[in-house]
Each structure stands twice: as C-alpha cells, then as structure tokens.
A protein has these predicted regions:
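Collagen/collagen-like triple-helix sequence repeat recognition
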Residues: 1-46
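Extracellular or exported targeting regions of proteins
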Residues: 36-182
Length: 182
C-alpha cells in the first residue's frame, strides 16, 4: 500500500532536561608560561659606545631606549642582564680579573623608565668590551602583592630562588620561564 505525503506538521514541544553526566577526569597542569617576561637582545654591532662615567669613573656608556622597561617593571619586577662571551652566557654585572690580578674589567648595567644603560671600564681606564658578542636582558614582572618591607626585585629573585633557579645561570632562567635560549 502506498500513500500520499502530506505537509510537514508543527514542531513538537521541547523535551525535558536530561540528567547531568558524570565529571570528566582532572586534566594535567599546563606548563608555566612566560607572559610576565620580555627578552631584549642587543648585538655587538648595534652598540655605539660613548665616553661617559659610572660612579665617577671614566667608562664607555651605551644607553638603550627600552619602552618595555615600564612602570610595571619598576614597581613589580626586575631586569636580569647577561652577556655572551665566546659561547658562554655570563651574568651582569660581569667582572673579570687577569691572571696576575693587576687589572680588572667591569661590564655593568642599570635600568630606569624606558631605558637600560651599559657601562664598561677597567682599572686602567675605559674598556671596549670587544669580546662580548651579544647582551640579553630579561624583564620580569611579578604582579603578586608584596609587603612594603621587600622590594619587587627581592620578590622576583626570591621566587626564582625558592624554585631552585640560579639567576646567574642564563639557561636556568630561560628554562624556568619556558624561553628559547637561542
């Protein structure tokens, strides 16, 4: 038997809500991110040293315009500096003494709002740090509330120290924050 098709009928009422399913398994913790870290790289070829002074000592000075060093970094963070000598990343400040102890070489830095300054000198005068091929600065902010008794720099450094990170080791800091060290 065959029949004719008629028009589609009206939509029926919605069904009742089904029962809640069981909870799924707990997921694994994700990797810590590096949202609070900015890395600034500075190649030797990009540095134009000028004569200046550091704490009254004649030195070579380079000032890097760095808008990334903002008020948040100054209020809640720190800037860690490193220099690449041969194939080794060394922490800043970097102090090298020759084998006889008659001369020391210094490469230092400081930072303020929107700038990072490098200083280079030696006991005998101005230093041209030609053996440094690159500088890297890690701007780290810690937005956790700190008491008025410790600075934001101490807060960041304490957090890294508590995690077993040696801040003088460039690779450990990169690994902690999930940053490609190259």
């Amino acid at each position: 038997m065959s029949g004719c098709e008629g028009p589609v009928g009206p939509v029926g009422p919605a069904g009742s809500q089904g029962t809640q399913g069981s909870a799924g398994p707990v997921g694994n913790d994700g990797n810590d991110g590096n949202a609070n870290v900015t890395v600034i790289s500075l190649k030797k070829a990009d540095i134009n040293w000028v004569s200046g002074s550091y704490l009254g000592r004649t030195s070579n000075v380079y000032e890097l315009g760095a808008p990334e060093v903002n008020q948040d970094i100054l209020d809640h963070g720190t800037v860690l500096g490193y220099c690449l000598i041969s194939s080794d990343w060394m922490p800043l400040p970097f102090i090298w003494e020759n084998t006889t102890g008659s001369s020391r070489q210094y490469i230092l830095y400081n930072y303020s709002l929107e700038k990072i300054k490098l200083f280079a000198y030696q006991t005998s005068g101005v230093l041209n740090p030609g053996s440094v091929s690159e500088y890297r600065f890690m701007l780290i902010t810690d937005n956790t509330v700190t008491s008025g008794r410790i600075s934001s720099v101490e807060s960041v450094q304490d957090r890294l120290n508590d995690a077993g990170v040696d801040i003088s080791n460039y690779f450990e800091v990169c690994q902690y924050f999930g940053i490609d060290p190259n």
